[in-house]
Swiss-Prot record:
Pfam families: GidB
Residues noted as binding S-adenosyl-L-methionine in the record, renumbered to the chain: 80, 85, 131-132, 146
CC annotations in GO: cytosol
Family: Belongs to the methyltransferase superfamily. RNA methyltransferase RsmG family.
Molecular function in Gene Ontology: rRNA (guanine-N7-)-methyltransferase activity
Function: Specifically methylates the N7 position of guanine in position 527 of 16S rRNA.
Signal peptide location: none
HAMAP family referenced in this protein's UniProt entry, alphabetically: 16SrRNA_methyltr_G
Record-given protein name: Ribosomal RNA small subunit methyltransferase G
Organismal lineage: Bacteria, Pseudomonadati, Pseudomonadota, Gammaproteobacteria, Lysobacterales
Coiled coil: none
Organism domain of life: Bacteria
E.C. numbers: 2.1.1.170
Keywords: Cytoplasm, Methyltransferase, rRNA processing, S-adenosyl-L-methionine, Transferase
Amino acid sequence: MNDAALPPDVSAALANGLQAQSLDADFAAPLLRYLTLLVRWNKTYNLTAVRDPREMVTRHLLDSLAMQPYIVSGTLADLGTGPGLPGIPLAITRPQLQVTLVESNGKKARFMREALRHLALGNARVAEARAEAVDEPAAYDHLTARALDTLAGIIAVGGHLLRPGGSLLAMKGVYPREEIAALPAGWRVGDVHPLQVPGLEGERHLVVVHKD
């Protein structure tokens, strides 16, 4: 399945979304290759509940890339990444970022390995394990989690991976006031950024939590 097998408006939707997010149009080609592979594998392996490639552009690619301005370089562990979201789009658009894709589901891990090979994406690797089982203490500058758990839950399973002074960047819908109030000792909110995702209705926030 090549890019031409996608509905004809998918490429335009992605191009418009990248422009709205002030991202280079050259990123469209590798992102479309990733999307094409995801659509193909999803028919057999049920990697995501989103089936429509047009929806995947908005709800997967552009939503993932909304956090891109806040992660520039360093090391990143993407916890519960599923089929590689947001980790693979971030690795594509931030080549200076070293990304570890943490996922315990074997089908999703196999898909991601194939995607990294297909894209020749040398700045990302797959850790097929639950986050709490990854034995790399204080190895990462950043953690991301897009739809994994509450803030406290993310910290409970993956906080050991973050170096002191590092940041957890968690994608949330409405402002998570109660989750912020329930942060464990040694963790504090640095910023909460309202996000605008092209084509996506509803509130989105990026919560940046620092490890003291």
